[in-house]
Amino acid sequence: EKIKRKRKELNMTLKDLAGSRITPGQISLVESGKSNPSMDLLEYLANDLNTTVEYLMESEETQAEKICLFYQNIAEAQILNSDLLQAEQNIDKSIYYCEKYKLEYQGARNLSLRGDIYMEQQDIASAQQFFLSANIIFIKNNSYEEIIETLLKLGKITLKMMGYQSASSYFKQAEKVFIDNQMGNDFLLGEIYYYIGYTYFKLENIENAIKYSYLAKEKFNQINSKNEYANSLLLLADGYNKKGDIKNAIKYSKVTLKVFKEINNLTYVSEIENNLGRLFYEFENMEESFIHLNKAKEIRQNTKDLKLIDTLANICENYIKLKSVSKAKEALKHILDYIEDGNNTALCKYY
């Protein structure tokens, strides 16, 4: 079937493909599955069809997994880019192959992506249900990174609902899975530490809140935004998919997803840096608070983030707490300058 499909894509007849190496009738038997080709013949066919022997020998299930991966990568990138309608359409395409070939792990990823969409739509109850369903399958398949990421999502949902003890349990489970399986992802560990610290703060366990806040701060590094680059990669991946070049489609969909994650991380890092600044303000460690607020300020200035005004206001509050009137006035001037640049949304937010 794959040989026939590639031949049709290249507008080749049986005779064109057969050449002087084999008869058109033998090619027809191979295409229909009535005859198994030798390795020599496979190499000949792969060469003439501009593909690889590995591709021709792949099972339909393996191909289906790759197709699912492509659609899931694109959907995840689109969710990060707030293109939820297109993301849903790509998840539906992935679901078709998952159900047809009974792909359990890919099915769990589809559930998780659905949960992400519900989170974006603020449908917390539905998101929670989809994440729980996905995690049952991730646990069954020992998919440790996915388990950790899902526990984090469940913890964040529980935080929104002010269930601090339950949230703490989810975050501590995530930490345990990470450590037990020696995951090598510093950003993920930093995220875990931050949320454990934040939850301890909400539970008024200040000693542990400080401990985990310091652990989190050691893990975060700034990432450069590459929004235009990511969008061009997305178009490239789609182009390869339309051409039927699944190998390159998957390759570029992976790169696209990585870049969109970096973009998302940049926004996320600025949020965490700002919040760490607030936490250290509460701990009355003003020096550490300024370090994190200034990092958040730099990122938000570079990315033109509307939340810059929050960070500027926090810096102003720090100076007020230190009774540094001149510095507080200077910080207030920065806020007013930002508003005078025409940022009406910031003006409303500030007042």
Functional labels for PLM-detected ranges:
Residues 71, 78, 90, 107-118, ...:
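TPR/Sel1-like alpha-solenoid repeat signature
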Residues 65, 105, 145, 187, ...:
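Residue signature of alpha-solenoid helical repeat architecture, marking inter-repeat boundaries
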